[in-house]
Structure formats: C-alpha cells, structure tokens
Amino acid sequence: MTKYIIVTGGVLSSVGKGTIVASIGFLLKSSGYNVTAIKVDPYLNVDAGTMNPYMHGEVFVTDDGAETDLDLGHYERFIGINTTRYNNITAGRVYFEVIRKEREGKYLGQTVQIIPHVTDEIKGLVKKAVDDTNAEIAIIEIGGTVGDIEGLPFLEAVRQMKLEEEENLMFIHVALVEYLRVTGELKTKPLQHSVQELRRIGIQPDMIIARSILPLDEETKKKIALFTNVKPDYILSNYDVELTYEVPLILEKQNITKKIFNKLGLEPKEPKVAEWLEFVENMKNPSKEVKIALVGKYTKLKDSYLSIKEAIYHAAAKLRVKPTLVWVESSDLEKSEDEINKLKDVNGIIVLPGFGARGVEGKIQAIKFARENNIPFLGICFGMQLAIVEYARNVLGLKEANTTEVNPNTKYPIITLLDNQKKIVQVGGTMRLGAQKIILKEGTLAYSIYNSPHIYERHRHRYEVNPEYVDLLQKYGMIISGVSENGLVEIIELKNHKFFLGTQAHPEYKSRPLSPSPVFLNFLSVASA
C-alpha cells in the first residue's frame, strides 16, 4: 500500500516547497524506501514547454521527452530518480483530458463538473504516476499558494484522498515566517492565516515547516501550535543556510524522518547521509577557485539555467573547487566592444541554450573569443549550433553563414530545421525531445569524457547541423565526435585547444550531486587546472 505525503504552501509562492519535497524524498530513499515525487501545477498550460523562462524558470526535460516544471529537476537531483511526464500534472492537462472524455462520451450523459469529474481525473493521474514506479512513498507538491482560485480543485482532490487513505496519507504545510529586523521578532500571523484557509477547505496539516531567516525558538513553535492545531514537535524550521543541499541535513537534525514514519505507520529506518554530507563539505571547503562565464539571453533570472548552474556545482564539489559564476547577457556583448572584456579574466566560457534571434551575435562573439584565446569552451544546444556558425564564418570564410532560425534566407544555411520538423505547425511538445542515443567516435575528446562507444543524453531542439556542410567543416579541422543513429551531428570539438566542445544535447539534466555530468566534470577540470 502506497503512503502519500502532500506538501502545500502558504503566505507566498517560491517559499521552497520543491526543495522540501526533494529533501524529504532524499531522506526517505536513503532510508531504503522506494520513493517518487509528483509536481502539481494549477496553471492551464498543458506543459511548461511554451513558457518564457523569465516567467517560469527553466524547462526541465525528462528521459521520455516531457517538458516539465523545474521542480522535477530538484526531485531528480536530490532523490536520484528519473521522472517521467506522469510526475508533472498541470490543470491544463487535467481539463484537456476531462473535455476529451466528455466529447468521446466516456461520462455517459452525465453533467460534467469539477466534483467529481475533475477531482477524479486528478486522483487518476496521481495513481498513474505512482503505479508506474511501484513507489512505497509518493510525495505530492501542490504548486502555488493556499487560497489561489486555480488550486482549489487540486486541494479538493487531495482532501478526498485523505478520506479514502486515512492511515496512509499526511499533509505537510510549508509557509513563510517573516522576521522583522526592527523589532527582532518572528511574525507567525500570515502562517496562521494560511493554515486557517487550509482548514476551511477541509485539510488539517499534520506537520508545518516554517521557512524563515532564523531557526524557530520553542515559544514561537508553541504559538504556531496553538493556532494551527499541530503539535509543537511537528513544527520544523527550514532556516537560511549557505547551500540548498544542506536542507535535508537540517531537516533530519529535527528528526523529520522519524516523525514521518510515526505518522504513516512505517518501519523506522536510519537515513544514510554520509556521502551527501561529504558532498556538502566539499562544496563548503574548496581548495581553489575557478571563474566561469555563462553567456545567455535570460541571465537576469538565474533559474532560467538552473540545471546548468547545479551541474557546475556538482562537478566543482567533486573537484574541490569553488565556482564563481560570471553571468553575461549576450545582447550586452553586441552593444560595445568593451563588453567582451568581461571574458578576459575567466577560466572557462559556457554558451547557454536559448531560442530566437536576440543576443545571437553576442554569443558568437563570446565563442570566437574562447576559440581564439584558447579558453575552455562548452556550447550547449543552441550554443553548439552557434559555435558551428562562428567557425563557418571565421575559419571557412563563409561570412554570411547563419542558422535559418535567425535568418531563413541566409546564403549559407549552416544550421537548418530538422527534416521531420518542416511540416509541423503546432508548437507545444513537438520538438526533438528526451533521451536520444549518441554514437561517439573513438580517439576524440567526447569519447574520453564518456569512456563509452555510445551514450544517452536528453534533447530539446528543432534545428540541426546542415548535412551538406559536414564534409566542409571536417575538411577545415572541426571534429564531429558524436552523431545520432540516423547521422545527425550531436557533438563537435576542435583539436589544439585546451577544451572546445559543443553538444546538441543537454547533459545538465542528468547531473546529480553524487554523480556529476562527465561533460561538466571534464570541462571544469580543465578550466581549473
């Protein structure tokens, strides 16, 4: 029988529910339980694929090609699981399924309503995600904040689940406790009100995790307990720490797993956290520093590239180095020649993924600077494509070379739309997505990085290297070190360079704290040498 932990949020969004879910998942899995985590997003988009990164942060791609919420990245990194499309449930997907079933006559003439049809669909999607993994414990994060109108059907669905699974389900409420510096007080009133709102809906939290600058003192816990009907022992602190990866450790210091085991009637087991603790210690005690420039078009919101940032941290911990990240807005490089000076003192340059024409020439300038100055370079997805454009312009002499994504009428279409994309009109969910096989060429940098004849990495793109130019690129010294099963260029590199690698894939999605991405590990190793 699967046990369920439902995590809700109060007071404001972005209070850290995703990190809490991931941390609890890690602790339970390291205790020996089979765990899965599910993110519920109440927005009407079917998935996150068409959202602007400034609005929603990065799109996290799963092995099966789902474009999902970035919280699934937290789940994968912390818990060490591979999620699927079933681990992200959106209101758009729920309503889409309900309307489809109504049109197909699946409801046999009933009046289709929020209760029971929408709530039943939500519960069915949760069950599907759980059944797919045979999870012993499923942690479900309800996105948004208690009181949001769009979240009400999801809260009603989990309220019904509690009725059906009385002994097998618990609620954890995560809410902000603000610290007033002027008076030196922790203010609990907003948290109290958010719990009151939950109780009006019919949900009584079993545990509260208070997000605050400082740990909660015992008096504050007793005050919260009095107004929320939650025992003081079940009120925990998620206070400010240096690293997100410390959150599981501070929760376990407060005996969170014992409390969960007790509430759900599970056999108590001790979580094994020694390796995780070593990882955290390595991050906090580096032996030297490495400065990495990240060149992209969404750098004002760092969460737009969250998995890349975390992949750097994973590799840095393994190497015992401190990464200083220099965020460079690619469009700024186009404004003045002086802007390129930002790259002079860095130890490595990563050109980040991103669609569209804005900032493209700035990215190309950064690539040229890395290539000509022998600075370790990594180009990811669009970053790889633009590395080829730069090479075509400045080495092959094809000055008007471009990608047809930017200039459909370019004289030299070095990057062009994938053949199977040319007749596609629909935007959402239609790219080349998910884990794809890459065949590596022996004797290359890519082969030495992975130490394998073939690998699987996740993808998210519509454009490819134009096969008509592959021979010419190789003639002028570019190495095609990885190709797909049907011959698409997947990885490129250059000889006589410290480290110059472009990959069509997104290796950051599979990086984990205890098993860093080989690409980032090797890049950072060279950059920090």
Swiss-Prot record:
What UniProt keywords are attached to this protein's entry? ATP-binding, Glutamine amidotransferase, Ligase, Magnesium, Metal-binding, Nucleotide-binding, Pyrimidine biosynthesis
Q: Where is this region: Amidoligase domain?
A: 1-266
Instruction: Supply the EC number(s).
Output: 6.3.4.2
The top EC class, named as a word, is ligase
Please name the GO terms that the record assigns under molecular function: ATP binding; CTP synthase activity; glutaminase activity; identical protein binding; metal ion binding
This protein's source sits in the domain of life called: Archaea
Name the Gene3D superfamilies for this protein.
3.40.50.880, P-loop containing nucleotide triphosphate hydrolases
Residues that span the membrane, as ranges: none
For CTP, which residues are the binding ones?
13, 148-150, 187-192, 223
Looking at the record, the residues that make up the Glutamine amidotransferase type-1 domain are 291-529
- Please provide the Gene Ontology terms (biological process) for this protein: 'de novo' CTP biosynthetic process; pyrimidine nucleobase biosynthetic process
Q: Which reaction does it catalyse?
A: UTP + L-glutamine + ATP + H2O = CTP + L-glutamate + ADP + phosphate + 2 H(+); L-glutamine + H2O = L-glutamate + NH4(+); UTP + NH4(+) + ATP = CTP + ADP + phosphate + 2 H(+)
Pathway as given in its UniProt record = Pyrimidine metabolism; CTP biosynthesis via de novo pathway; CTP from UDP: step 2/2
Record bears the keyword Amino-acid biosynthesis? no
Q: Which residues bind UTP?
A: 13, 187-192, 223
Q: How is its activity regulated?
A: Allosterically activated by GTP, when glutamine is the substrate; GTP has no effect on the reaction when ammonia is the substrate. The allosteric effector GTP functions by stabilizing the protein conformation that binds the tetrahedral intermediate(s) formed during glutamine hydrolysis. Inhibited by the product CTP, via allosteric rather than competitive inhibition.
PROSITE patterns for this protein = GATASE_TYPE_1 (PS51273)
Q: Where is the active site?
A: 381, 506, 508
NCBIfam families assigned: PRK05380.1 (NF003792), PyrG (TIGR00337)
Q: What does this protein do?
A: Catalyzes the ATP-dependent amination of UTP to CTP with either L-glutamine or ammonia as the source of nitrogen. Regulates intracellular CTP levels through interactions with the four ribonucleotide triphosphates.
- Any other noteworthy remark? CTPSs have evolved a hybrid strategy for distinguishing between UTP and CTP. The overlapping regions of the product feedback inhibitory and substrate sites recognize a common feature in both compounds, the triphosphate moiety. To differentiate isosteric substrate and product pyrimidine rings, an additional pocket far from the expected kinase/ligase catalytic site, specifically recognizes the cytosine and ribose portions of the product inhibitor.
> Which family is this sequence assigned to?
Belongs to the CTP synthase family.
Q: What is this protein called?
A: CTP synthase
- Annotated organism of origin: Sulfolobus acidocaldarius (strain ATCC 33909 / DSM 639 / JCM 8929 / NBRC 15157 / NCIMB 11770)
The lineage is: Archaea, Thermoproteota, Thermoprotei, Sulfolobales, Sulfolobaceae
